[in-house]
Amino acid sequence: KTKSYMANIMAMPEVFFQLEVSNFMYGHNARYSSPIPTEKDWDNTDYKKAYDLFKERFADASDFEFFFVGNVTDEQMKTFSEKYLASLPALNRKETFKDTGFRGKDGVHKKEVFKGNDDKATVRISYAGETTYSVKENLAMQALGEILTIKLIEELREKEGGVYGAGARGSLNKLPYGSYSFSISYPTNPASADK
């Protein structure tokens, strides 16, 4: 049932585009490419290994971080914590990460993806690289994405009328290494894609 559902998802041009771009940028690296499994992935899944990994990861909640959102009193939070968190197993392990050394493509690249019959194109411009992480710079990058989204909508949609919508987003990541990413994306008609 899930295989057929995922096959239907993969038939959607937008999803196919995202997967192709991800595979192109990250060289089909399973740790960085799209999490959408193919039919071959489903056929090759080792369910026992997946279940064993699940059990191993959730056998120790001592280094988990919990975030609670909602309108609760301190007393309610205490009751919920005692009921749901205090009973979780704890082995006092400290989790860490491992930088595998993998990095995505750098430099300038162009990738064209064709899928579907609609007279529609999606343009994505991406920038990425290594940098020193800071909370301040991360907030600045996110703000830049928000501001650029407003400007893109003003210029491309409202003034030129050549796109249906536009968006930009940026962020810095601390782990597994200091990096930044910034992307601009918008759907348009094929004639306007190279403008």
For each of these PLM feature ranges, what is it?
Residues 76-77, 89, 133-136:
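Short helix/loop capping segments that flank catalytic or ligand/cofactor-binding pockets
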Residues 52-55, 110-114, 168-174:
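Short beta-strand/turn micro-motifs at beta-sheet edges
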Residues 93-151, 155:
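His/Glu-based metal-binding/catalytic segments typifying zinc-dependent metallopeptidases
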Residues 48-84:
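Non-catalytic, conformational "gating/processing" segments within enzyme and secreted inhibitor domains
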